[in-house]
């Protein structure tokens, strides 16, 4: 995100759910957060965006509201929003996919170029495999350091099959900060 001229101006960084910025938010601003605390490896990435007017937006590729994951998220977006906040309620990502970080990047890249949240969500179809490939391809073209989607997907499915858990994965918190 730092390498993108449209994002670097307002990108605050990448954070675990329990270490979100406590200082006053400047507007516009954005960040990527993991739903896990700093003591866990990380399981799912989401994005926050605060408009120039002080409205807050929460983007989750599974379409969940902030309080689904953490009271910290709800407090953060409420504190950071001067007026109101909203979230996307449409599931976009495949259940066994592990490209949630790419969805967060996709959202912020488009949002930082002025595209509204609803318009970004409308880019996607009901075909989650198509959506997953689209965001991965988008990110891979712009940020070549992102790994191979097929390998990531196979690894995630194998790990989930062993644990019998829904689609989640682990990443390091700094994975997306230099893009």
Regions found by a protein language model. Name each.
Residues 143-179:
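Disordered regulatory segments flanking catalytic cores
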């Amino acid at each position: 995100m730092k390498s993108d001229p449209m994002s670097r101006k307002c990108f605050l960084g990448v954070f675990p759910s329990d270490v979100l910025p406590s200082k006053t938010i400047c507007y516009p601003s954005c960040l990527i957060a993991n739903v896990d605390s700093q003591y866990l490896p990380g399981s799912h990435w989401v994005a926050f965006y605060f408009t120039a007017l002080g409205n807050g937006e929460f983007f989750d590729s599974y379409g969940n509201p902030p309080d689904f994951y953490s009271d910290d998220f709800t407090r953060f977006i409420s504190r950071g929003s001067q007026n109101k906040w909203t979230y996307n309620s449409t599931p976009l990502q495949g259940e066994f996919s592990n490209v949630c970080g790419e969805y967060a990047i996709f959202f912020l890249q488009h949002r930082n170029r002025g595209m509204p949240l609803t318009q970004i969500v409308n880019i996607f179809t009901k075909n989650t495999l198509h959506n997953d490939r689209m965001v991965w391809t988008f990110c891979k073209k712009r940020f070549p350091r992102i790994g191979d989607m097929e390998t990531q997907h196979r690894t995630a499915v194998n790990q989930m099959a062993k644990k019998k858990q829904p689609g989640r994965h682990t990443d390091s918190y700094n994975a997306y900060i230099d893009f």
